[in-house]
Structures are given as structure tokens and as C-alpha cells.
Amino acid sequence: MAKLTKRARLIREKVEATKSYDINEAVALLKELATAKFLESVDVAVNLGVDPRKSDQNVRGATVLPHGTGRDVRVAVFTQGANAEAAKEAGAELVGMDELAAQIKAGEMNFDVVIASPDAMRVVGMLGQILGPRGLMPNPKTGTVTPNVAEAVKNAKAGQVRYRNDKNGIIHTTIGKVDFEPAQLKENLEALLGALKKAKPAAAKGVFIKKVSISTTMGAGVAVDQGTLEDAK
């Protein structure tokens, strides 16, 4: 507990809760405060000007970050025939149909992303109660239900992040690791915000990107001045 108390005290001393920081200053603060004994992720929370109670204002999608996320992503693909070979060549760890579904039903879930070709959804659909709660259910909006499974595998491996606003209208995702260069984290964040702006629902009125905060896995959030980000202006 002493270490947690010391870290909490340091955060209080260094981070002004009501201040929005220049992106470079915010990243420098995160790096200074990242004292965990493991390599922490850099996470982002984006408050959107949407009413999540209305289906036409929910935001969901995916984008490939220019510098990836720093994670090794294991991919499972539901497909068959030529698509199965293409998925394997693209780097998918697990490829199959009914036999892959049987593995998942048996509790074997050694993967981070699930991709499916449209003809495989008859099999994947039966796994909704298993994959859905884990956020793994393939969906056309995130590019994980597609006839071009090879491209989807490559995107997942290249550092694609999926996003979906929660019940409070906030997007939570990862933009890298704390050992990334500041410029890499900035460019990843700008790429995410650019994708979010393109995904703005027509029904959403007023300011769309209301607040942007970044944090490490074990750290406090640091608000970012959007004026210092290219794609948030």
C-alpha cells in the first residue's frame, strides 16, 4: 500500500485536475509517472457529444494506428477454402469453421481478435453468448466481418484499434505503450481522433469531441489541450 500511496501523492503533486495540457507535456507527465514494474499501456478516453441512449448517435468502428499499439495480437479467423489459405498467409494463428467453434465452446480462447467472412457467420452466430460479452464478436462496422479476411488480419496485426462509445458517450481505447516516442503517441492519438471525426453521426449536434484524456494503465488521467492536436482542431 505504501507504494500506491506514494504514487498517488506524486500524481496529485504533478497533475492539475482542472488543467488541459499540451500533448507533449501530457505525454512527458505520463512517462514520469509510469512507475509500475511492467510496461504500461497508454490509454485514451474521448468524451463525445452524443446521446448514447439514441441508436443513431452511437459511434462504433476501427482504425489502424500509424505506429501500432505495441501489442502482439493473436487472430482467429472463421472462413474456408481459398480465404482460409489467405488468412493463414496473412498471419492468422487460428483458422477454421466448425472445429474452431468447438474449440471456443470448450473454453480454448487463445486469441485477441476474431474475424469472419460473411459465409462463416452461420457458425459464428452460435457463439454470440461467448464472444459477445468479451467484445470479440465480429461486426461489419469494425471491419471484422468481411470477404477480404486477409486484409482484416493484416490490419489487426498492424495495430488496428476498435472503438465503441460506452453508456456515457465515452470512447476508451489504447494508443501505444509508455516506451513509445512522444511523437508516435501524438500521431497515434491524432489518427484515432481523425477516425472518430469521420464517424460522427449525422444526428450528433454541437461539439463532437468534448474532452480528450490520456493515462497509463496504473496512472491518473491527464486532460489534453485539443488545440495541440492536428486532427482535433
UniProtKB/Swiss-Prot annotation:
The disulfide bridges present are none
Q: Which GO terms describe its cellular component?
A: cytosolic large ribosomal subunit
The GO molecular function terms of this record are: rRNA binding; structural constituent of ribosome; tRNA binding
Any GO BP annotation = regulation of translation
Q: Which Pfam family is one of those matched by this entry?
A: Ribosomal_L1
Q: How does it assemble?
A: Part of the 50S ribosomal subunit.
- State the similarity comment: Belongs to the universal ribosomal protein uL1 family.
* Descriptive protein name: Large ribosomal subunit protein uL1
